[in-house]
Amino acid sequence: MADAPHIPDEAETRARWGDFEWTPANAIKVKEIIGRYPPGRQQSAVMPLLDLAQRQVGAETQTQGWLPVPVMEYIGAQLGMAYMRVYEVATFYTMYNLAPVGRYHVQVCGTTPCMLRGSDDVLAACKNKGLVKGHTTPDGLFTLTEVECLGACANAPMVQINDDNYEDLTYDSMSAVLETLAQGGQPKIGPQIDRQTSCPEGGPTTLKEMVSENHDYRGRWNQPA
């Protein structure tokens, strides 16, 4: 998490997470994940295990989850990795949170396409709702982070909130997304304007049948001319 301070390995953290272990359901998932790799290559499973652990911590704390030091040590021991190697992976990728976050982790893209298309307005909407970069709101609901490219440049500006993208945002639509979440609702995922995925704003110019239905054109491709 780019803007958040790293949580030190303090006694309170160890008291809370020192006895971390997989839930029965997640233990089955871990076995399946490690089984994807050849014998002796189990360390390749470190990324999906970190993600799974973060989600388990999130479920236990009713937040988006994070990775306390004892949890990373637990994963390292299971995979035969030094803790520092696990930590190196966790600190490289911004989808791993090294500090507690709120129920909704609001990640605002601030790179060039989003900046040119209005990411400052998106951040202003967040600020108006009481969100501060690198911090969690007092009610524990939102954590705001400014991140690098999230891969939806054609739909700039955009944010990722937990596992969902909200795209083609304005000040007003970002405010509405946050308000809906604060009220316990689920905003529309994806483009916040009248647009199908990343098609032109005026609508698609080809394959128009796919606008209203998941039309499968492959049957036509296989027909003789």
What are these regions (language model features)?
Residues 1-225:
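Signature of N-terminal electron-transfer/Fe-S-associated modules in redox systems
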